[in-house]
Amino acid sequence: MNLFTEIRTLVTAELGAMTEAGDLPAGLDLSAVAVEPPRDPAHGDMSTNAAMVLAKPSGKPPRTIAEALATRLAADPRISSAEVAGPGFLNLRLRPAVWQGMVATILQAGDTYGRSTIGAGQKVNVEFVSANPTGPMHVGHVRGAVVGDALARLLAYAGWNVTREYYINDGGAQVDVLARSAFERYREAHGLEPEIREGLYPGDYLIPVGEALKAKYGDSLLDKGEQHWLTEVREFATEMMMQMIREDLAALGVEMDVYSSEKALYGTGKIEAALDRLKEMDLIYEGVLEPPKGKTPEDWEPREQTLFRSTAHGDDVDRPVKKSDGSWTYFAPDIAYHYDKVTRGFDQLIDIFGADHGGYVKRMKAAVAALSAGRVPLDIKLIQLVKLWKNGEPFKMSKRAGTYVTLRDVVEQVGTDVTRFVMLTRKNDATLDFDFDKVLEQSKENPVFYVQYANARINSVLRKAREQGMDVSDATLATADLDRLDHPAEIALIAKLAEWPRLVEIAARTNEPHRVAFYLHELASELHGLWNRGNDEAGLRFLQDDPVVSQAKIALARAVGVVICAGLGILGVTPVEEMR
């Protein structure tokens, strides 16, 4: 049950009644009418912009509309007051019984409270991580993996049919570098000195690959030239790296539904098919691009190339898809890959890219818009950097030097749950500080602890109540005398719980799972605030001498626990029942 949707339905019904009464003209578009929490809680429980958005199309002053609407709304038994503010905003206060009833609603719904059907079963593809298969995942990949997986969980929670997908970048030059690096470890496995030349991957993680190559091929490759072993070693090393990456993802609680290979696009006609489709729309041509201003990108040539007319779909410049020597640019297989996703019948595509792919956003959106005839929206989320801190100092990494911090390093030091939660404590496009010391602190400054501690406190109340012989099942607590929850601090906590279904829908529509983490922190803050006030005001404690009052307060605590557990589930974090 979404209380905000319920009150919006009331508002639009009264606007319809005003139309029938001749107070408003017929045919008004009510889609922009919103009901939401006011910016300042002192102004009321909810606020609506109805009068503001209808003033111009109705030809009436907004305050005139607001005053007439306020009179009608105040007559509803759920509304205690409706006050016009400013130029025509309408602030509403709900009767305590509405809030008190929310506790029973939550307990009756259980883990379905907040679930939504706004996705309507639409098929959405969330592509994330897609790290080059050249080594273990590092901390930079962790954030994208967590954001992508949490987003997939959120969308499924809100009614979408979600596919998690990993695009294996195994068609470029980097996998040849991997093969050459692995071959040196193969030589090392035979007792020879490896030649880790400039540009090769020096990490020790390739030593097991060299040993595995030795086990499979013996010494048969040692005396052969690169042209004889490159393909086999590349495929062997790539598969071992992907197995390592799958294990890394599993350690983070991430499981992909589909793994797609870039290499599979070559030689199968898929790239040609995608570009032929664009050519049919007159979006492929031969031409010479003007030299770009500033830094010259690697796909620019001062000669004729095959170009995609991406400017026809919002890009700044047209983009090369085939070089003058006949080879494909990096963009060409990406177009083919996204065309493949379109032809698989997805209604929506989401890509989670690193911040260094910012220049790819417009061209990729242009390609999908063209290939789907505007039917399939593509949302690209850019993941900013993670800055590591340890012992109060920045901790830097270098992949080329083989000294980077891996996903396993992070998970082994702080755990999967802490890692996942912290990675969602900032919006994806903001740099995130990950302090190995602070994320394990038991203090209110640590958001992971703060939320988990709230859940642990709730469970401590339930345990004590059981020890006293109380039935604390959801079904029984839902029948409590909830009128006893009449303190403003208790009502404020319930009001925060009432925001959960609305928050889920907003987060899902905007593809922003960090909103869930932010909300959980706010909810935990309300719970801790009420708990701490109980230290000084005995009447606010969750366990009371009066069993009727006690049952009502325990019902409230349990309702908070239901929502916290639901939110943590979306984040992929296991709720803690007891702090140790």
From Swiss-Prot:
The keyword Cytoplasm applies. Keywords: Aminoacyl-tRNA synthetase, ATP-binding, Cytoplasm, Ligase, Nucleotide-binding, Protein biosynthesis. Its main location: cytoplasm. GO terms for molecular function: arginine-tRNA ligase activity; ATP binding. A motif ('HIGH' region) lies at residues 131-141. GO terms for biological process: arginyl-tRNA aminoacylation. This is Arginine--tRNA ligase. It comes from Cereibacter sphaeroides (strain ATCC 17023 / DSM 158 / JCM 6121 / CCUG 31486 / LMG 2827 / NBRC 12203 / NCIMB 8253 / ATH 2.4.1.) (Rhodobacter sphaeroides). The gene is argS.
